[in-house]
C-alpha cells in the first residue's frame, strides 16, 4: 500500500470515474500516517460500512459512519492531500492528474493542524491528538447507523 502526502494538488472529480483503486484524503485533517494506517487496518478487518474498500478507508479515517459526512470532513479538496494507492502504477497515474509536489510532511502535525483536527474530530481536553483520533476511528463500531 502506498501512502504519500502531496502539497498543492488540484482535484478533478473525473479521477474518481477512472476505475482505479485509490483514495485521496484532505491532508490538512490527517493526524499523521499512523491515522491513515489505522483507517486502512479497520477497513480491512471490520464489518464494512461502505460498498468499496477504498470508500471504507475514507469513512474510517473520518471517524463517521455516514459517507456524506466523511466526505465533508476528510474528503479530497484542492491543496494538501494524502494519496493512498494499491501500487506504483496507480500512484503515477493519479499523481499526473492532480499534480502538486510529493511532500510527506503535509501528513505531519503542527500547532495549527492540531487545532483544526481537535475541532473537526471534537477532541476536548488534553492528550495526544493522534491517539485520540485513533480512538474515534475505533469507536465507529459502537455508533448506531
Curated annotation (Swiss-Prot):
The gene is cgi121. Changing residue 138 to R: No effect on Bud32 binding. Coiled coil: none annotated. Changing residue 139 to R: No effect on Bud32 binding. Component of the KEOPS complex that consists of Kae1, Bud32, Cgi121 and Pcc1; the whole complex dimerizes. Component of the KEOPS complex that is probably involved in the transfer of the threonylcarbamoyl moiety of threonylcarbamoyl-AMP (TC-AMP) to the N6 group of A37, a step in the formation of a threonylcarbamoyl group on adenosine at position 37 (t(6)A37) in tRNAs that read codons beginning with adenine. Cgi121 stimulates Bud32 kinase activity via an activation of Bud32 autophosphorylation. It comes from Methanocaldococcus jannaschii (strain ATCC 43067 / DSM 2661 / JAL-1 / JCM 10045 / NBRC 100440). It comes from the Archaea. Belongs to the CGI121/TPRKB family. Pfam families: CGI-121. This is Regulatory protein Cgi121. Changing residue 138 to R: Severely affects Bud32 binding and does not stimulate Bud32 kinase activity.
